[in-house]
């Protein structure tokens, strides 16, 4: 710390001392300048003031001045010492007399009275570069002008800023290394003959054209020179290299590459030059010599120091909004996708262990959470047990992924991620709530369930070590089950606090699908008029949930405000006349690209199966049947029930020309819900070899791995290099694990290897489907060889309770409303004829991105219904939020009033 403070003061003081040397010399130079006219680079023709006599100035004076100023470099050493030639007693000869400091001062005194006051024309000494002698110096480094006015004030301001930093913010100033500045190898300007690799102009693109106050500039030592940094006594940003940041105008690593800023800039192609010139037309970048810097040496005599950006800044994130998550392309309908031909200008920065082809294929773009999402995240991280809700498309799942990542960073162990259904659990990389509890279906009395859990050592340990329990799709969790979980947690953890001291984070929308009502008693008898019991009705909810937050901002239908209003009018079941008319107008057929038809949503699974079978039978050709491989340790009745929650079918029938849907997220464009068409069935190895033969000249080892990236294989060895700040969906893609664990060579790895062998035996003589997917922009297609994937329900130790291996495809002419919950569909047809459940109409209609991608058949407002308990719950919730906001406003007003009174008294 002390060395860093001394370094700043030492550099500032040393620069001032050398600046004084320059100023002392300038009076002599002014006298010489009044007699000298530099007309070309080869001959110097001095002239007497009277203009009557010309003579050649001796070369000794020329070399003495240049050598003196060249050695007098404020950055040549990190120590304050007399290192120049004159301070060592060395002298130069001028007209037969040695030139020393004293002689220069004497010349100065003699000419002060004789020399006229410098004018604007003679304030600058022009020196032109000899191209034969100075090939290793940039044109911009040898500026044609030397401004010495106002420099003393700049130095004093810089020194004052350094003193304020050392006095007030000593804790913020850190040096990662004590490496002193290395003195660059001095090369004589006359003896330099080696051409420089960096000839031509170097633009400081990272330096703002509107330069801030000189007092905000500081310098940083580096192995290759001095970096110009921008700092402030009141705002200092710490990074791995320096407590200050480089003044920059870029915002992301990709933009850095687009602007051509790098450690080793090379020659640009014509296309790149055109792009660069177009981006610079509005405000031309400043050259190195044009940047005002209070510590700079006169540019015509200084060495070519490097001023380069800090390359270890991985991303540009705003302070306080560092929690990244992903925004799928289906939620950005208005954003055009980049043209593949433009990839040469938009290459991502390479990361260790991730090749460039993979980076382009796995283009998962991070976003910043909204203010309300950020507020929820902060409440969760502070330990508050809460429930957050919102209408369809408000980013509940996006926020949940960010919450999971942040909690796992805070608690490496003890974060249980669960959901009410297997499908919802797969979407967030978790397990079902029943699997977490370890009591099977959860039927029976609490005492018996506790005994069952205690016999299961893993389940018992899981209950004892859990710190945070996350439940997604809480709307489908029965209230009686939540009460049982609360009692079990208190008993197993021997803690009478709510949920035994476990923090509870619940997410969902009760206006969507309700819990499944059990219409049979424990003895098997049929029950009539069984009313649903929601989670918010349970005593566990009232005891545990401390805060409820409603998300207001909608992302899925963003840009179609009328459609947002139409969907909001459906939530409580009271459909206005104008909203009903708007939905009736959506009965027109949709326009889709050739070969793709909209997916139809039906209320029952029977309708879905019949519609898909009819469509498949109309296609000529042979049917290719893929049977799933199902395993697990659960007994058969429970295993079968859990498998029904998986979106992957037990039997998948495909033909060439069949419309399918991808049911896994692979990047921000090829996501769960992307429609495609089977164009062929190919052998995987043969297809890869044929692709390699088509492009033999351009294929490299990196491109081979990039091609593997387009082939979805959950059984490839998990990649151990994962970006630290990667979103959850991106980590799942890299590791191939839904549970997001990079497994070592353990029993779990051996188990998965055995599953792979079993799968390959079943698919031994079968080919893989080649699918042409329509990306969410509605224009771009991507052709992919699809390989089998694995869906598992596991406990925290990795033991597979239930597993299914199947291709991540389903026939997509028709889907059930139940399985469409949580998905985003670009083209969808909703037939409301057989809708029977509360919330079904709202779930089905809200899957669409916009009205342009939605067709509604048989719209009937009587089919739109919401449960009265849910309506009452949200009504009370809304009034409670209003009271909280008004109370907070009153509190803020009181605090402001108290502060005003205190100021008045002072």
From Swiss-Prot:
Residue ranges of the annotated DNA-binding region, renumbered to this chain: 840-859
Molecular-function annotations in GO: 3'-5' exonuclease activity; 5'-3' DNA helicase activity; ATP binding; ATP hydrolysis activity; centromeric DNA binding; DNA helicase activity; G-quadruplex DNA binding; single-stranded DNA binding
Any single GO CC term annotated in Swiss-Prot or TrEMBL for this entry: mitochondrial membrane
Annotated stretches, region: Disordered: 77-146, 229-297
Binding site for ATP: 390-397
InterPro entries to which the protein is assigned, alphabetical: AAA+_ATPase, DNA_helicase_pif1-like_DEAD, P-loop_NTPase, Pif1-like_2B_dom, PIF1_helicase, PIF1_RRM3_pfh1
Family that this chain belongs to: Belongs to the helicase family. PIF1 subfamily.
Job of this protein: DNA-dependent ATPase and 5'-3' DNA helicase required for the maintenance of both mitochondrial and nuclear genome stability. Efficiently unwinds G-quadruplex (G4) DNA structures and forked RNA-DNA hybrids. Resolves G4 structures, preventing replication pausing and double-strand breaks (DSBs) at G4 motifs. Involved in the maintenance of telomeric DNA. Inhibits telomere elongation, de novo telomere formation and telomere addition to DSBs via catalytic inhibition of telomerase. Reduces the processivity of telomerase by displacing active telomerase from DNA ends.
UniProt protein name: ATP-dependent DNA helicase PIF1
């Amino acid at each position: 710390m002390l060395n860093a403070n001394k370094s700043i003061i030492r550099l500032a003081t040393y620069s001032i001392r050398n600046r004084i040397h320059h100023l002392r010399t300038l009076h002599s130079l002014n006298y010489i300048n009044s007699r000298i006219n530099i007309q070309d680079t080869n001959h110097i023709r001095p002239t007497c003031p009277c203009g009557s006599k010309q003579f050649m100035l001796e070369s000794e004076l020329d070399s003495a001045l240049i050598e003196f100023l060249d050695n007098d470099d404020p950055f040549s050493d990190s120590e304050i010492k007399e290192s120049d030639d004159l301070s060592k007693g060395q002298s130069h000869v001028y007209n037969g007399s040695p030139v020393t400091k004293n002689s220069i001062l004497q010349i100065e005194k003699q000419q002060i009275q004789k020399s006229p006051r410098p004018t604007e024309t003679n304030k600058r000494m022009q020196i032109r570069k000899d191209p034969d002698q100075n090939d290793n110096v940039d044109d911009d480094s040898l500026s044609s002008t030397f401004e010495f006015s106002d420099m003393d004030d700049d130095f004093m301001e810089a020194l004052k800023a350094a003193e304020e930093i050392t006095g007030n913010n000593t804790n913020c100033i850190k040096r990662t290394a004590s490496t002193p500045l290395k003195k660059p190898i001095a090369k004589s300007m006359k003896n330099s003959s080696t051409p420089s690799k960096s000839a031509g102009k170097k633009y400081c693109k990272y330096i703002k054209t509107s330069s801030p106050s000189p007092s905000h500039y500081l310098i940083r030592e580096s192995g290759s020179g001095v970096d110009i940094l921008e700092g402030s006594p009141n705002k200092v940003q710490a990074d791995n290299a320096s407590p200050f940041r480089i003044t920059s105008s870029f915002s992301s690593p990709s933009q850095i590459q687009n602007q051509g800023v790098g450690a080793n800039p090379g020659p640009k192609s014509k296309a790149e030059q055109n792009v660069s010139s177009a981006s610079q037309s509005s405000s031309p970048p400043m050259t190195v010599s044009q940047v005002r810097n209070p510590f700079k040496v006169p540019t015509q005599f200084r060495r070519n120091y490097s001023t380069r950006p800090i390359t270890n800044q991985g991303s540009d994130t705003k302070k306080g909004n560092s929690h990244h998550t992903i925004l799928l392309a289906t939620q950005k309908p208005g954003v055009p996708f980049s043209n593949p031909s433009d990839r040469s200008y938009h290459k991502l920065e390479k990361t260790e262990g991730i090749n460039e082809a993979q980076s382009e294929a796995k283009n998962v773009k991070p976003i910043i959470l909204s203010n309300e999402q950020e507020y929820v995240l902060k409440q969760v991280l502070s330990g508050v047990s809460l429930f957050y809700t919102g209408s369809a498309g408000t980013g509940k799942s996006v926020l949940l992924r960010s919450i999971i990542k942040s909690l796992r960073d805070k608690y490496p162990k003890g974060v249980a991620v669960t959901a009410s259904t297997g499908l919802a659990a797969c979407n967030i990389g978790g397990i079902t709530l029943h699997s977490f509890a370890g009591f099977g279906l959860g039927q029976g009395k609490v005492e018996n369930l506790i005994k069952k859990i205690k016999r299961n050592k893993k389940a018992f340990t899981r209950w004892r070590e859990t710190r945070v329990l996350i439940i997604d799709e809480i709307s489908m969790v029965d209230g009686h089950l939540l009460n049982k979980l609360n009692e079990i947690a208190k008993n197993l953890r021997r803690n009478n606090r709510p949920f035994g001291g476990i923090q509870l984070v619940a997410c969902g929308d009760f206006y969507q699908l309700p819990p499944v009502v059990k219409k049979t008693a424990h003895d098997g008898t049929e029950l009539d008029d069984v009313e649903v019991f929601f989670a918010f009705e349970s005593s566990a909810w009232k005891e545990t949930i401390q805060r409820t937050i409603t998300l207001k901002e909608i992302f899925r239908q963003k840009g179609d405000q009328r459609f947002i209003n139409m969907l909001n009018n459906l939530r409580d079941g009271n459909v206005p006349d104008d909203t009903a008319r708007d939905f009736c107008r959506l009965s027109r057929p949709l326009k889709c690209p050739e070969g793709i038809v909209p997916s139809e949503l039906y209320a029952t699974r029977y309708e879905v199966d019949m519609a898909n079978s009819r469509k498949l039978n109309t296609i000529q050709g042979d049917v290719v049947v893929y049977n799933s491989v199902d395993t697990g340790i659960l007994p058969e009745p429970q295993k079968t029930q859990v498998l029904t929650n998986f979106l992957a079918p037990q039997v998948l029938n495909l033909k060439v020309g069949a419309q399918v849907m991808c049911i896994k997220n692979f990047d921000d464009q090829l996501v769960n819900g992307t429609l495609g068409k089977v164009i062929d069935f190919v052998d995987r190895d043969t297809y890869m070899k044929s692709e390699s033969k088509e492009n033999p000249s351009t294929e490299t080892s990196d491109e081979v791995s990039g091609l593997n990236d387009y082939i979805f294989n959950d059984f490839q060895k998990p990649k151990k290099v994962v970006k630290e700040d990667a979103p959850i969906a991106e980590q799942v893609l890299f590791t191939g694990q839904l549970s997001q664990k990079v497994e070592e060579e353990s029993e779990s790895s051996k188990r998965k290897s055995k599953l792979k062998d079993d799968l390959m035996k079943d698919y031994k003589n079968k080919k893989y489907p080649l699918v042409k997917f329509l990306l969410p922009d509605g224009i771009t297609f991507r052709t992919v060889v699809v390989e089998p994937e694995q869906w598992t329900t596991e406990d925290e130790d990795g033991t597979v309770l239930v597993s299914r291996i199947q291709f991540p495809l389903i026939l997509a002419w028709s889907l059930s409303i139940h399985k469409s919950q949580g998905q985003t569909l670009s083209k969808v047809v909703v037939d409301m004829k057989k809708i029977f459940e509360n919330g079904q109409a709202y779930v089905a209609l809200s899957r669409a991105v916009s009205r342009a991608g939605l067709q509604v058949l048989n719209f009937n407002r009587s089919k739109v219904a919401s449960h009265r308990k849910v309506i009452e719950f949200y009504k009370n919730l809304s009034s409670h939020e209003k009271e909280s906001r008004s109370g907070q406003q009153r509190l803020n007003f009181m605090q402001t009033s108290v502060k005003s009174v205190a100021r008045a008294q002072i």
